[in-house]
Amino acid sequence: FSKSEIVKYYHVNPEKITVVYNAWQHMQRVRPDPMLFGEYSKWPQLKKGEYYFSMSNLLKNKNFPWVLRAAQSKPQVMFAIAGGGSLAKEAAALGLDHLNNVMYLGYVTDGEAKSLMENCKAFLFPTLYEGFGIPPLEAIACGAPRVMVSNTPCMREIYGSHADYIDLSTNHGSVDHVTPGRDAAAVLQKYSWEGSARRMLE
């Protein structure tokens, strides 16, 4: 996808472009935070397997409002959103700051992110535009039971049939209306930092 965009907008000879993908093995070195769901949890409202998790910021391509609308449609389930920027202020500007089932976690450590990914109900990534989109791959590597991504050319290229797809043209905020994928963990076999390094050296 990124290669085709470069060719389209910068008129570069496609034969001069080599695609080298991101990977996920760095998450193997991260130790999940053991205290996150313990007796003295930082976020006691979050229960294992009972919350949706997303990582966002105020960049429009991240489609933060979609997550809020999804939370609005499921008031009985918690939605945890990690990331920088004044997300709460943006929610207020959208008139969606009244949602009691949304938690703004701010910046999280790698250990916290891993723990949040492996214990969530599903990881949400409703992006409008990406060059790769590594967070869903990290979530799969961490053991997230479901990963929901937007049905865009980039996401289709990276995740194939191994993710649940959100059709943003018709789905304006629902985690229930998605096209299910299969065997998400199988996508991990496609990407490795070692393979990417070899390709760079070539």
Regions found by a protein language model. Give the residues of each.
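Carbohydrate transferase catalytic cores enriched for Leloir-type hexosyltransferases
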Residues: F1-E202
